[in-house]
A protein has these predicted regions:
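Buried hydrophobic residues that stabilize the cores of well-folded domains
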Residues: 19-146
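Sec-dependent N-terminal signal peptides
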Residues: 4-13
Length: 146
């Protein structure tokens, strides 16, 4: 009985890893396709902050495919890219530059399933955290909402 339960848990873990791996492969393909397209209609919106900011929306055939935000807040710059398919965020890249700390840069990557649940997160040190059932409470993991 113990061997049977152990085998069951092992199989669930392998299936979960396989599902995440398949989704990540799909995300990378969509990401490459989005970035290879060169004829986007780009809408720019200035954000009235004390240090400034901008939102750029990239449309292909009137469908929103990518959003880039840049915000300056005191001694930092926050740059984010949201990748969108079928109206939902599937990947987010976040780069924070700290000007007061020798221009230190911190990168984070967020991967989402088809329902915008965070399934994989890569922290600034490169550590990968993944869970097919969704990850909760990761700073900066918000999806794009217009």
């Amino acid at each position: 009985m113990k061997k049977m339960l152990l085998s069951l848990f092992l199989m669930i873990g392998i299936c979960s890893f396989s599902t995440i791996r398949q989704r990540i492969t799909e995300i990378k393909k969509d990401y490459a396709e989005t970035n290879s397209y060169k004829s986007y209609r780009i809408e720019k919106e200035r954000i009235d902050l004390s240090e400034g900011g901008e939102i750029r929306r990239y449309y292909k055939n009137n469908v929103l495919r990518k959003v880039v935000t840049e915000f300056y807040t005191g001694h930092t710059k926050q740059y984010a890219e949201y990748y969108i398919k079928n109206g939902k965020t599937y990947f987010k890249y976040l780069l924070t530059t700290y000007f007061y700390n020798g221009n230190k840069k911190e990168e984070k990557r967020y991967y989402y399933d088809n329902h915008e649940n965070l399934i994989r997160y890569i922290d600034p040190s490169g550590k990968i955290i993944a869970n097919e059932n969704g990850l909760k409470d990761y700073e900066g993991s918000e999806v794009w909402e217009d």
